[in-house]
Amino acid sequence: MDKKSFYGLGRRKSSTAKVYLYQSKDKGKITINHRNPSDYFPNKLVIQDMEQPLELTKLKDNFDINVVVKGGGFTGQAGAIRLGIVRALIKFNPDLKKLLKTKKLTTRDKRAKERKKFGLYGARRAPQFTKR
């Protein structure tokens, strides 16, 4: 049986996710680093955020999804997986891009941690000011 696969790369904060979609006849199974999403992520909201493009396009049961994700925390990893799924779905069917773009799922969230500056305690926290 020749399985057709689609690849998408997603990034968010310091996380990178390689997403592989495999067409399947049975219920869509998702594995993240060889684990179930419920075992990998601590709460359901992160999983719902990650599965949003599949729910929107109603293609959740059509694909088995294999994800390799590295770096960052859980929300960053979920955002990276979501973007990877979106990019792979667009490779599967370019007509889905219009639907996904209306929900702003195709754009990468470029927000990242601001760097620490010298003379300060953090990115913006300054030493306490003394008037006299």
Swiss-Prot record:
The keyword Glycoprotein does not apply. The keyword Magnesium does not apply. GO terms for cellular component: cytosolic small ribosomal subunit. GO terms for molecular function: RNA binding; structural constituent of ribosome. InterPro entries: Ribosomal_Su5_D2-typ_SF, Ribosomal_uS9, Ribosomal_uS9_bac/plastid, Ribosomal_uS9_CS, Ribsml_uS5_D2-typ_fold_subgr. Keywords: Ribonucleoprotein, Ribosomal protein. Signal peptide: none annotated. SUPFAM superfamilies: Ribosomal protein S5 domain 2-like. It comes from the Bacteria. PANTHER family: RIBOSOMAL PROTEIN S9, SMALL RIBOSOMAL SUBUNIT PROTEIN US9M. Belongs to the universal ribosomal protein uS9 family. This is Small ribosomal subunit protein uS9. It comes from Mycoplasma genitalium (strain ATCC 33530 / DSM 19775 / NCTC 10195 / G37). The lineage of its organism: Bacteria, Bacillati, Mycoplasmatota, Mycoplasmoidales, Mycoplasmoidaceae. The gene is rpsI.
